[in-house]
Amino acid sequence: MKNNSIRTVVATGIGAALFIIIGMFVNIPIFGNTSIQLQYAVQALFSVIFGPITGFFMGFIGHALKDGIQYGNISWAWVLASGITGLVIGLFGKKYDVTMGKFSVMSMIWFNLAQALGLLIAYGVVTPIGDKIQFAQAWSYLYAQSFVAGVANFITIAIGGTLLLAIYASSRTQSGSLTKD
């Protein structure tokens, strides 16, 4: 258990650092303060490999620090949404366990269903309500911004996350694949 907690803490720290760096230097603005954020594909990979706790804190800590450094203020609803996205993807990780060297079409479907659920909770509920409380913006703007971000993140994770997981799975040795000559 102790090794597992150390592994989780280290993975969270590395993941949060990657979240910050990728988020600050690799983003494509699309709407308002919303942009395509490629760090969510990496967060999906970490969430599956290291579990939901790492996924949550990688997104939560990484997003909070990124916003603080980049903008000088933090939108806590969006920070929480990043954490929830990683948490939900990680919670369903057993459905698409890539550590055994397999990432089948069915695993890809489960992965994308899980990320869709996480994004629906994060951007359909958390960000609009949280921003209404924190910034008192108009509901129409909040839902439009959340919808665009949710769709952009879905596409990013569906393409980038699926590719990263497929590459990772192909680098693992499958059970029973080694034979003695």
Curated annotation (Swiss-Prot):
Q: Which PANTHER family match?
A: UPF0397 PROTEIN BC_2624-RELATED, UPF0397 PROTEIN SPR0429
Q: How does it sit in the membrane?
A: Multi-pass membrane protein
Give the family per the record.
Belongs to the UPF0397 family.
List the Pfam families: ECF-ribofla_trS
GO cellular component terms, alphabetically, are: plasma membrane
Instruction: Provide the protein's localization.
Output: Cell membrane
Q: What is its main location?
A: membrane
Q: Which residues form a coiled coil?
A: none
- Name recorded for this polypeptide: UPF0397 protein str0306
> What species does this protein belong to?
Streptococcus thermophilus (strain CNRZ 1066)
Listed transmembrane segments: 11-31, 45-65, 72-92, 109-129, 147-167
Keywords tagged on the record: Cell membrane, Membrane, Transmembrane, Transmembrane helix
